[in-house]
Structures are given as C-alpha cells and as structure tokens.
C-alpha cells in the first residue's frame, strides 16, 4: 500500500496541494493550522513518536467481460513519524511492508499459481523504504488543506489520489513485467476518529480506523505484461502505537526478513520507493 502511503511521492505532492474548506468543529479543523494538527494526530502523532498504520486487504483481478476474481490478500503496515520544523512545516518519515497471502489459508506466500497464465510466479513482497512526504507551513488566513468533515460523533478525513507518471519498468526493458510506458493508478483513503478524542488537547495521537481502496496495474512479478485488466484492492486498517500491537504473523515475518521496518527511517531522504522501483532493484532487466 501504499499507505499515505499505501502516500507515494506523486500522491504526497497532490495531498500537500489539496485546499478544501470545511465546517468548523469543536476542535479547530477549518483553519490550515488546525487541520495540520488534526491530520498529524490522526495519521500518526504530533509529538514525533512512531505509529503503525496496519492494513488488511483483499486483491481482485478485473478482466474485461469477466466477474472480478479474488486472487490473494495482502496484510502489512506503514510505520511513520512526523518531524516538525520551527516554521510550522513538517516532514513525514515512513516505510512500509506488506505480505501477499493465500486467500483461503491466510498463509504468507512464497509462490503464486497464476490462474491467467498457468505459471507459478515467485512473489516479491512489498518493502518500500522510504515513503516520505513534506507539508509546508500553514499561512495566516489560509483555507484548510485537508478534506476533513464532521459526521455526528465522528471526524472523517477523505483522500482521493489519482496517479500518473512514467513507468519505472519500461516495456523495452521489462517486456513481461511492464504494463506500458505510463504507471496509472488511484488510491482512496477514508480515516475515522472520534470528536471527543480530538477534543483532548493533551492527546498527541488519537485512535483511528480507516478504509482503503486502490486501482492499479498488474504487479510486475505476476508477469502479465499488457494483458487487458487491472487490480482492485479493497481494504481496511487501524492505527497502533507499538510494533507489538501488530498481528503476530506480520510481526514475525518482519523480524525475520525486514527487521529495520520495526521503526521509521532515521532521516528524510528521497526519492521514495514503490513496488515498481523496488522490483527494478531486485530483478535487473534481462541482458543487464
């Protein structure tokens, strides 16, 4: 997932530019500074502590003329923290892992029998480091940047993030992994918190649940090339304050294979990693 990455670099830029006025709540979520504070407390913590946004996702293959087919699940998390500057701007330092699972047994997979090609594919799990973003300092009188709304006792943050940029895996270099010259996808988040939790000014972080949906191309390791169709991701998640709060199988697999993902990155670096750039690093193009 890309969490707020399940936020990639282009998505983070779109989010930072999103300027939407919203009704005022008992907590200040209408001004730019109030919304920045609310966003930080919902997404992670305003005091710089690590928080873990876990997710549970079902992945469907959508082929023209066919009923969408559940092909696997993916469970994982993003670990991130905010670093605030004296001028009011902030950086979000994060990285994320997600593991593909058998939809029936829930076991973390090493290989996957592709029902479309009848080939057995070696899985490359998601290990994106970093997944960073920047948020400029709020300006006096500036409208709110984030689409936050009140709904009864709840505060809801809704983000739609369309993505389009040159594919890191170009067809000439990766003929069976690439779906074309452009990477086209979209991510959709809805975060939920309680108004009463946000009204507690001493709470640097508040409980959050969220939903996540995504449309995206075939994954490189599926080796589907330009075959018509795409992937549809349907998931939900919850924020946790500690690594030990995550599901046991995700924790154990992470400790055994990606131990550095138990905490956020130490410093802000670019560019961000995606499943496509990670694949390029792990699997050199044929002939190279």
Protein language model regions, located:
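Bacterial N-terminal signal peptides that target proteins for export
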Residues: 1-12
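Absolute N-terminal positional cue centered near the fourth residue
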Residues: 3-5, 20-25
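Bacterial N-terminal signal peptides
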Residues: 10-22
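N-terminal segment immediately downstream of the Sec signal-peptide cleavage site
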Residues: 26-102, 110, 235-241, 248, ...
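Predominantly extracellular/secreted and cell-surface proteins with exposed
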Residues: 67-201
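A eukaryote-biased signal for long
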Residues: 163-288
């Amino acid at each position: 997932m890309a969490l707020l990455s399940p936020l990639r670099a282009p998505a983070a830029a779109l989010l930072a530019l999103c300027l939407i006025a919203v009704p005022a709540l008992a907590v200040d979520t209408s001004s730019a500074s109030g919304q920045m504070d609310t966003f930080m407390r919902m997404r992670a913590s305003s005091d710089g502590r690590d928080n873990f946004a876990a997710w549970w996702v079902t992945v469907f293959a959508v082929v023209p003329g066919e009923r969408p087919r559940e092909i696997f699940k993916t469970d994982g998390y993003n670990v991130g923290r905010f670093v605030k500057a004296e001028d009011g701007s902030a950086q979000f330092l994060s990285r994320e892992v997600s593991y593909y699972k058998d939809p029936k047994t829930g076991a973390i997979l090493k290989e996957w029998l592709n029902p479309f090609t009848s080939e057995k594919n070696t899985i490359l799990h998601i290990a994106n480091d970093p997944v960073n973003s920047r948020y400029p300092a709020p300006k006096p009188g500036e409208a709110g940047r984030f689409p936050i709304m009140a709904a009864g006792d709840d505060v809801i943050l809704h983000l739609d993030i369309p993505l389009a940029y040159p594919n890191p895996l170009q067809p000439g270099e990766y003929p069976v992994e690439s779906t074309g010259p452009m990477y086209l996808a979209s991510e959709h988040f809805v975060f939920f918190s309680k108004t009463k939790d946000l009204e507690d000014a001493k709470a640097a972080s508040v409980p959050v649940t969220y939903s996540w949906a995504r449309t995206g191309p075939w994954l490189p390791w599926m080796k589907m090339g330009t075959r018509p169709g795409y992937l549809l991701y349907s998931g939900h998640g919850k924020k946790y304050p500690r690594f030990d709060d995550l599901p046991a199988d995700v924790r154990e697999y992470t400790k055994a294979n990606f131990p550095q993902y138990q905490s956020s990155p130490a410093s802000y670096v670019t560019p961000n990693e995606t499943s496509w750039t990670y694949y390029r690093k792990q699997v050199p193009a044929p002939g190279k």
